[in-house]
């Protein structure tokens, strides 16, 4: 039993790390896996801490860039504007997420069919956007104007619906607002840092009375898998989307969403 629990923890950590930064909805995948496979033994502490593994993955890959930003911040106006832009983009999710946290977790997260619908809708949107003949105006995340950042931030709030995808909403929003594919994915990475850290801190605070570290081995295994797989995705995603776009992720969403919907209709 312990061995299978460790496999479960490794699998869930792997899914979290692989899907957190690509536009397929990590939350949607984890909810469907939990519903169909009954993976519930890991508990709230596990859920919170594998998110931390994904957060540390992106921070480790971007550590050199973050250090350079911190060094340039006092003397470079462009760097200060970029940091302000990321914070501006983060604000809508911070405010709306805090206000609607109970509804999101208590209602939306209990609806597997909604997850499947959102996966399918998001898949069609990704395929549509990937085929558009867009003429990007912004090729560097440092050059995003503040109004564009704010608009991306509001679009990110759609990801509070499970199955939408935080990275998917920000990437599609960035593309439609004039960014090229590489910078759209990279801005999604930067925006993930405060958004995921804020969500992690808020979940940790809300769950402080029920957290338990009794299953320490499961938590460690899930955390490590989320970290390793997250590092892999962050290191390779920008080059991939620059060459191939987002069609693969669109098709993946359609397959998973359709299969999940069929399974719900047949087995419930």
From Swiss-Prot:
GO terms for molecular function: undecaprenyl-diphosphatase activity. It is a multi-pass membrane protein. It is an enzyme of class 3 (hydrolase). Pfam families: BacA. Its main location: membrane. Disulfide bonds: none annotated. It is found in: Cell inner membrane. Its EC number is 3.6.1.27. It comes from the Bacteria. It catalyses: di-trans,octa-cis-undecaprenyl diphosphate + H2O = di-trans,octa-cis-undecaprenyl phosphate + phosphate + H(+). GO terms for cellular component: plasma membrane. The keyword Translocase does not apply. The chain crosses the membrane at residues 11-33, 46-66, 84-104, 107-127, 144-164, 185-205, 213-233, 246-266. Keywords: Antibiotic resistance, Cell inner membrane, Cell membrane, Cell shape, Cell wall biogenesis/degradation, Hydrolase, Membrane, Peptidoglycan synthesis, Transmembrane, Transmembrane helix. GO terms for biological process: cell wall organization; peptidoglycan biosynthetic process; regulation of cell shape; response to antibiotic. Catalyzes the dephosphorylation of undecaprenyl diphosphate (UPP). Confers resistance to bacitracin. Belongs to the UppP family. Bacitracin is thought to be involved in the inhibition of peptidoglycan synthesis by sequestering undecaprenyl diphosphate, thereby reducing the pool of lipid carrier available. This is Undecaprenyl-diphosphatase. It comes from Brucella suis (strain ATCC 23445 / NCTC 10510).
């Amino acid at each position: 039993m312990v061995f299978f629990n460790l496999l479960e923890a490794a699998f869930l950590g792997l899914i979290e790390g692989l899907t957190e930064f690509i536009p397929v909805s990590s939350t949607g995948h984890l909810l469907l896996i939990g519903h169909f496979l009954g993976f519930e033994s890991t508990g709230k502490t596990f859920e919170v801490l594998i998110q931390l593994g994904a957060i540390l993955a992106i921070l480790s890959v971007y550590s050199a860039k973050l250090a350079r930003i911190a060094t340039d911040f006092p003397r470079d106006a462009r760097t200060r504007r970029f940091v302000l832009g990321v914070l501006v983009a983060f604000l809508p999710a911070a405010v709306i997420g805090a206000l609607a946290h109970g509804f999101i977790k208590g209602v939306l997260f209990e609806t597997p069919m909604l997850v499947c619908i959102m996966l399918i809708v998001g898949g069609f949107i990704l395929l549509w956007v990937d085929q558009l003949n867009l003429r990007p105006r912004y090729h560097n995340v440092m050059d995003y104007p503040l109004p564009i950042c704010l608009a991306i931030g509001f679009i990110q709030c759609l990801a509070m619906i499970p199955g939408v995808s935080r990275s998917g909403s920000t990437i599609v929003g960035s593309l439609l607002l004039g960014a090229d594919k590489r910078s759209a994915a990279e801005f999604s990475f930067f925006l993930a840092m405060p958004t995921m850290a804020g969500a992690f801190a808020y979940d940790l605070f809300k769950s402080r009375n029920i957290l338990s570290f009794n299953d320490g081995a499961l938590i460690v295994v899930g955390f490590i898998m989320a970290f390793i797989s997250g590092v892999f995705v962050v290191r390779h995603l920008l080059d991939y989307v620059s060459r191939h776009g987002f069609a693969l992720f669109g098709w993946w969403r359609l397959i998973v969403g359709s299969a999940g919907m069929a399974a719900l209709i047949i087995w419930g």
